[in-house]
């Protein structure tokens, strides 16, 4: 039985199951599944990733899905305000479509057309060198379908050359680092983005760095912290930021949390233009971190799975040049265990 036939069979047996999970049960990547669907309900796309992203601006509203193994982040918005120079790119629309792109990870693109209970659904799906989905861009009822069709005509190709998938590079991480030096450099930061440089300089994972410094910089909290802080944010009505990412893409929500619904092990946020599904039992560690900036410290809640994957990161909404929200700091403070000086 070929992959496409098996896909149809499993999809019928598991209505509502994510393509990623069905591909996993077939022991193939999601990109390999898309490859198998070509000539049926998928088409290969060719061209520079930046050109395809730039062309997406013309279609207007889309629904974008960025996910990892444990969290799914869905945001409605348009591909305006693009900055796609070099290996890093930005789609910069706070409170709408807000993306951070690591373009050297982007490898293949497919157009997929599916029949659902709600009618036909069209998407453009981007995959990395390992065959995992980085970003899925869906047409909505408000998408300019004439512009969408023009984009497809420009980039779809008849060639479906074999995928050249690579294994994930095993991270080489430091087993010994000078805790006092790491802490000193952490306290000397003036911008949250300097944290990535600190990790790289010492060859550390985020969690390793957290374990090296004092509790006022990084403090482990209960794995139920996410549910607690979402409930607080919903009740208080302050704007928060929710980051979910993978190897090549991070999608950011900024706004008020309107509806939080736990369901079948998933913690969900349902807003009109934003949805989050996060597998709550996958949270193996939760950390509150404080990073110094020129505007005072910035506090985040960071969630990790047992395999070290960063599931999600949450911040209080903050505009550059302004101090962090007092309400967010209060909500974060309620997560800190009693007796911990943080």
Could you describe each region identified by the protein language model?
Residues 1, 8-13, 91, 98-196, ...:
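Hydrophobic, ordered structural segments
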Residues 55-57, 97-102, 114-122, 234, ...:
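Short, low-complexity cationic-aromatic patches
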Residues 1-31, 240-250, 255-257, 261-342:
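C-terminal functional regions that serve as terminal interaction/effector modules
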Residues 96-107, 223-226, 272-288:
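DNA replication sliding-clamp ring fold and its partner-interaction surfaces
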Residues 52, 228-231, 289:
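Generic recognition of flexible, low-complexity loop/linker segments
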Residues 72-73, 131-136, 250, 308-312:
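Short loop/beta submotifs within extracellular cysteine-rich repeat domains
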Residues 1-115, 119, 340-342:
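An N-terminus-focused feature that recognizes amino-terminal "leader" regions
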């Amino acid at each position: 039985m070929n992959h496409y036939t098996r896909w149809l069979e499993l999809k019928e047996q598991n209505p509502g199951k994510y393509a990623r999970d069905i591909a996993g049960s077939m022991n193939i990547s999601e990109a390999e599944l898309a490859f198998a669907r070509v000539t049926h309900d998928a088409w290969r796309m060719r061209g520079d990733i930046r050109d395809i992203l730039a062309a997406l601006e013309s279609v207007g509203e889309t629904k974008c899905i960025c996910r990892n193994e444990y969290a799914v982040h869905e945001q409605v918005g348009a591909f305006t305000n693009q900055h796609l120079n070099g290996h890093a790119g930005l789609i910069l629309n706070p409170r709408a479509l807000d993306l951070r792109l690591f373009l050297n990870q982007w490898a293949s693109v497919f157009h997929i057309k599916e029949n659902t209970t709600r009618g036909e659904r069209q998407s453009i799906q981007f995959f990395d060198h390992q065959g995992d989905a980085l970003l899925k861009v869906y047409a909505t009822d408000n998408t300019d379908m004439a512009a969408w069709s023009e984009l497809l005509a420009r980039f779809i190709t008849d060639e479906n050359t074999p995928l050249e998938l690579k294994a994930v590079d095993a991270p080489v991480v430091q087993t010994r680092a000078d805790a006092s030096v790491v802490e000193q450099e952490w306290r000397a930061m003036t911008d949250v983005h300097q944290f990535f440089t600190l990790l790289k300089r010492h060859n550390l994972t985020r969690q390793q760095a957290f374990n090296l410094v004092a509790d006022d910089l990084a403090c482990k909290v209960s794995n139920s912290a996410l549910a607690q802080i979402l409930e607080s944010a919903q009740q208080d009505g302050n704007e928060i930021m929710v980051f979910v990412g993978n190897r090549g893409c991070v999608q950011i929500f900024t706004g008020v949390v309107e509806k939080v619904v736990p369901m079948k092990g998933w913690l969900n946020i349902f807003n009109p233009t934003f949805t989050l599904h996060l597998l709550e039992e996958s949270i193996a560690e939760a950390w509150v971190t404080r990073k110094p900036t020129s505007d005072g410290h910035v506090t985040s809640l960071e969630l990790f799975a047992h395999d070290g994957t960063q599931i999600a990161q949450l911040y209080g909404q903050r505009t550059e040049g302004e101090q962090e929200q007092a309400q967010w700091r209060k909500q974060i403070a309620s997560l800190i265990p009693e007796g911990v000086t943080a």
